[in-house]
């Protein structure tokens, strides 16, 4: 029995090196290896192609075992003997790839690289060298990437400069506001100081001189009577200064409202005047047009009369339609008729 089973590994090794096995596998790999690459990602198409490869190998092995008469048990024992020898592992590798996906993937990637190298060799033989797209492709891409990086850096630099300018302008604006607010806060609020500087409150301008004198004397008496309560006096002095701008603002608002009313009235009057002038102009224009129309009609009438007169003068006198026939002509006509009748009679007799 042992001698009978010794020929099985040799026959299997011979089949795996025969064209019946190598040609179908080579055609399958060459037609489907272009999808496989060196990336670590396992795509769905890889598994589908692996299933198709497994079905092909099983069909070829089944046909071989049926032709030779080998059982599956004998085939598995021969496969275990192949694993011990390193030289036969490369021959038996396509069979093991049916159960090992990574081995199948490595075989397909290797086949794809071999086909690419063969294609480059053929192109080099035909053209005498490789084209620039195949030799300088990496360098061109790197140059494009460098240009893009330079453009991005320039854009970032300009955007940063614009941002700094905007922030600087905002800082200057805030400093100007702070300076204006500080200058406003430093201005004196005391009415006596404002009067000494030549600036007067709107209330003080509206008050008469007698009231001003009375208010000044009253304040002096109060100051003399209540010297210890200086703080209250200061507060009472500060009150008019606070109220004055409010009243002034009210007066300003009233004056602005009055100005607006006056402007509206002026506009209304202007529009009324414009409408009146437009109506007058329309009336004058219509009258002028009527006058011109009357003149044209009169001229047409005069020219029509002149034409009729000239036509009547130039026309010849009509000749009488029927002139009276003289006696001599009547006699001649009768003679002609008589001659014509005689001629007719002679012709008829003949």
Swiss-Prot record:
Residues 142-167, 280-350 form a coiled coil. Residues 177-220 have a biased composition (Polar residues). It comes from the Eukaryota. Its main location: nucleus. The lineage of its organism: Eukaryota, Metazoa, Chordata, Craniata, Vertebrata. GO terms for cellular component: axoneme; ciliary base; motile cilium; nucleus. Residues 171-233, 301-337 are annotated as: Disordered. It is found in: Nucleus; Cytoplasm; Cell projection, Cilium, Flagellum. The gene is cfap36. Keywords: Cell projection, Cilium, Coiled coil, Cytoplasm, Flagellum, Nucleus. This is Cilia- and flagella-associated protein 36. Belongs to the CFAP36 family.
